[in-house]
């Protein structure tokens, strides 16, 4: 099972930027799956993307149910890239010679780049990985300069995740937001290794700035509610700070 599958969770965004970003990189429709949270959107998506696009539906309440729909679509052991629907392109940090600053470079060979991550996962018995939640050059450079390509047992957002399908990876559908962080913390507590790749990032819309997706929830300020619930469920692991949560300590691997 060597193929990588690209799976997009989408809601009310028929233009689906991520689909077009994948096609620009030469990814075949046979390896792209778009899962709709609202089955009523099916016709609109087909009209926007064409009949060749693989579109699956399941009426669900939130992105957690949509991502589970994707996971249930594949067999155990499948290599899956879980994606948001608002990604313009994918980037990798490249260091420069001498004193020149490094820079983000657009990835064109996605399979080659992402296979390196999956190889790392297989060697280290890791089934779930993510990337940095920011495209800020200073943040990325700080990890690369330390030689820290990968971080372990930390929080990763769900916009670009690497999954080797297994039973323990299941989003809690009671969580309307922060379902990615909840899964991270639950797996760490259960003794699984979560990892983050620090030199690959998705170039995507700012959270809560583009209609569709999670836009309405962000506009209603629901994120603060779910941050508090996350801290309440995992008080020994995270603490709330402004609009996010921080790990209280480094968890062993």
Predicted regions and their residues:
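Short acidic, S/G/P-rich loop/turn micro-motifs used as interaction or catalytic elements
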Residues: 11-15, 40, 87-90, 136-138
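Active-site-proximal specificity loops/subdomain of glycosyltransferases
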Residues: 35-83, 88-102
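A structural signal for short, well-ordered beta-strand segments and their strand-loop junctions
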Residues: 79-84, 127-132, 194-197, 239-241
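C-terminal catalytic/acceptor-binding lobe
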Residues: 4-5, 10-14, 175-253
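Short loop->beta transition adjacent to catalytic acidic/histidine clusters or analogous donor-positioning motifs
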Residues: 2-5, 24-34, 51-54, 78
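Short, well-formed alpha-helical segments that are part of the catalytic scaffolds
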Residues: 5-27, 40-47
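A short acidic (Asp/Glu
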Residues: 17-20, 43-46, 91-94, 139-149, ...
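Conserved catalytic core of nucleotide-sugar-dependent glycosyltransferases
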Residues: 90-182
């Amino acid at each position: 099972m060597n193929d990588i599958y690209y799976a997009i969770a989408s809601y009310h965004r028929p233009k689906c930027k991520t689909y077009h970003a994948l096609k620009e990189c030469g990814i075949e429709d046979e390896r792209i799956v778009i899962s709709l949270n609202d089955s009523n959107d099916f016709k609109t998506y087909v009209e926007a993307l064409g009949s060749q696009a693989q579109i699956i539906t399941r009426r669900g309440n939130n992105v957690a149910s949509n991502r589970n729909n994707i996971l249930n679509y594949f067999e155990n052991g499948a290599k899956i890239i879980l994606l948001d629907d608002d990604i313009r392109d994918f980037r990798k940090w490249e260091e420069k010679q001498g004193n020149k600053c490094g820079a983000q470079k657009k990835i064109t060979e996605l399979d080659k780049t992402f296979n390196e991550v999956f190889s790392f996962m297989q060697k280290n018995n890791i089934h779930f990985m993510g990337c940095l939640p920011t495209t800020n050059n200073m943040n990325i450079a700080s990890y690369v300069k330390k030689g820290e390509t990968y971080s372990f047992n930390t929080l990763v957002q769900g916009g670009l995740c690497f999954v080797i399908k297994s039973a323990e990876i299941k989003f809690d559908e009671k969580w309307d937001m922060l379902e990615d962080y909840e899964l991270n913390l639950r797996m760490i507590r259960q003794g699984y290794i979560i990892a983050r790749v620090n030199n690959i990032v998705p170039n995507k819309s700012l959270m809560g700035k583009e209609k569709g997706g999670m836009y309405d929830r962000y506009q209603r300020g629901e994120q603060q509610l779910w941050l508090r619930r996350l801290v309440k469920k995992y008080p020994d692991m995270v603490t709330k700070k402004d609009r996010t949560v921080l790990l209280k300590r480094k968890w062993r691997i």
